[in-house]
C-alpha cells in the first residue's frame, strides 16, 4: 500500500532561528518523504533545519512518484536561515569562530541544502530541482525566513504567537487552483502555513508540554 495523505496549511519550524543558534546533531530535515510515498503537501512553510525537503529513494518509488505528479508539492515555501552555511542551510554543529576559509565549518561553505535527493532519484538532483521549480507548482526557495514575515516568536521557548507579522506575504500567499488532491475537505483559506490573522492555538495549546506535569 502507498502512503497518500494530503497535508495543507502546515508550518514546520526547526530550532535554528539564526546562524549562531546551537542545535542538536539529531536535527536533519524539515520533511523527509520515503518508502514509495504518495503524500501531497500544499500551501505550507518550512524553515530552521539543516536540510529542507528530502525525497529519500533509498527504497525507490518516491522520486518517480514525484516526477509523475502522484506525490505533489505545491505552493510550498522552503526558507533558509540567514548566513547559515553560505546558502541558508548548514550542519547542526556549525562552528564559526576561527574556522579556516577552506574548512567544512566555514560560514560560506554550504553543508545542507533546501532540496535534497537520494542517489537513486530518477534523473538525479537536477531532475528533482527542475520539477520542484515547475512554474505551475508555485513553490519558492526563500533565502531567509524573515523575508516571509514569519513571526520570530515561533522560535522562542514558552508561549508563542504564531500569527505572521503585519504585512506578511504568508497572509495572502495560498493558492488552491493547482491542488487537485485537496478536494472539498479543506477550507480554502487565503493564508499559507498553519496560521492566518487569528491565533487559533490560544488558549488551549500547551507550548511547555516538556515541563508541565499532567495528573
Stretches with model-predicted labels:
Residues 1-215:
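Extracellular beta-rich repeat passengers
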Amino acid at each position: 500500500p502507498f502512503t497518500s495523505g494530503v497535508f495543507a496549511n502546515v508550518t514546520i519550524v526547526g530550532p535554528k532561528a539564526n546562524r549562531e543558534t546551537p542545535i542538536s546533531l539529531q536535527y536533519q530535515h524539515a520533511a523527509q518523504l520515503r518508502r514509495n510515498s504518495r503524500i501531497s503537501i500544499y500551501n505550507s512553510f518550512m524553515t530552521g533545519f539543516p536540510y529542507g525537503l528530502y525525497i529519500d529513494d533509498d527504497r525507490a518509488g518516491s522520486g518517480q512518484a514525484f516526477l509523475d505528479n502522484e506525490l505533489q508539492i505545491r505552493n510550498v515555501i522552503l526558507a533558509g536561515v540567514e548566513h547559515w552555511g553560505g546558502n541558508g542551510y548548514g550542519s547542526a554543529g556549525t562552528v564559526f569562530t576561527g574556522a579556516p576559509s577552506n574548512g567544512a565549518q566555514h560560514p560560506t561553505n554550504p553543508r545542507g541544502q533546501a532540496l535534497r535527493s537520494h542517489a537513486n532519484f530518477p534523473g538525479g538532483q537536477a531532475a528533482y530541482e527542475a520539477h520542484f521549480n515547475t512554474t505551475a507548482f508555485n513553490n519558492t526557495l526563500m533565502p531567509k525566513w524573515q523575508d516571509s514575515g514569519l513571526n520570530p516568536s515561533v522560535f522562542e521557548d514558552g508561549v508563542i504567537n504564531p500569527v505572521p507579522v503585519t504585512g506578511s506575504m504568508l497572509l495572502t500567499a495560498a493558492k488552491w487552483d493547482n491542488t487537485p488532491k485537496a478536494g472539498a475537505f479543506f477550507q480554502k483559506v487565503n493564508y499559507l502555513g498553519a496560521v492566518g490573522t487569528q491565533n487559533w492555538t490560544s488558549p488551549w495549546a500547551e507550548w511547555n508540554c516538556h515541563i508541565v506535569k499532567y495528573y
